[in-house]
Regions:
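Short, conserved charged micro-motifs
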Residues: 50, 88-91, 130-137
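Conserved short beta-strand edge segments in small beta-sheet-based binding/regulatory domains
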Residues: 68-70, 144-161
């Protein structure tokens, strides 16, 4: 997946594209960061190797319009901890990861990097652009499930001091 951002006067816009081999199409997801974006598909009848070239040309067009690639420095860590869960329940772990990935991804605000159970409970590390909006979105997504109770969201300062966000 290719992910690009463009800074507006008051907000960031996102543009994401990837090739779906099975369907022989490009999926494109666009919108304002922090707001549910729109998605559309572009059909293609080209061979797979030409699809990468076509995607690169598309990326070049978007960059000419002011979009830039997302770097690790653009993303802030958001930790989502469930004290009452552990990694033994693999299905639950993957379900929560999917919920986090979906709620952050559909708003162009980030993604979930997976879970860790070394700190007590189960902790998911997400990488986000706008941490305040991500907290709102994650809390809302979890509120709609049975996983909301007992969740804690936090991040770290550059000096490794912990900041509790909920």
């Amino acid at each position: 997946m290719i992910r690009l951002l463009k800074k507006g006067e008051k907000e960031w816009w996102f543009w994401e594209a990837w090739y779906e081999e099975k369907e022989a199409l490009y999926a494109v997801h666009v919108g304002t960061v922090g707001v549910k974006g729109g998605q559309y598909s572009v059909l293609t009848d080209q061979a797979a190797e030409n699809n990468l070239q076509a995607l690169q040309e598309w990326i070049n067009e978007m960059k000419a319009e002011g979009y830039v690639g997302v770097t690790t420095e653009d993303l802030q860590p958001l930790h989502v901890q469930f004290f009452h869960l552990d990694a033994e329940d693999v299905e639950t772990r993957y379900l929560i990861e999917q919920i986090l990935d979906e709620c952050l991804g559909m708003t162009g605000n980030g993604h979930c990097d997976g879970g860790d159970d070394s700190r007590g409970g189960l902790v998911f590390i997400c990488r986000v652009l706008q941490i305040d909006q991500a907290v709102v979105d994650v809390r809302q997504a979890l509120r709609e499930t049975s996983f909301f109770e007992g969740v804690s969201l936090f991040t770290f300062h550059s000096d490794n001091s912990c900041i509790i966000l909920t």
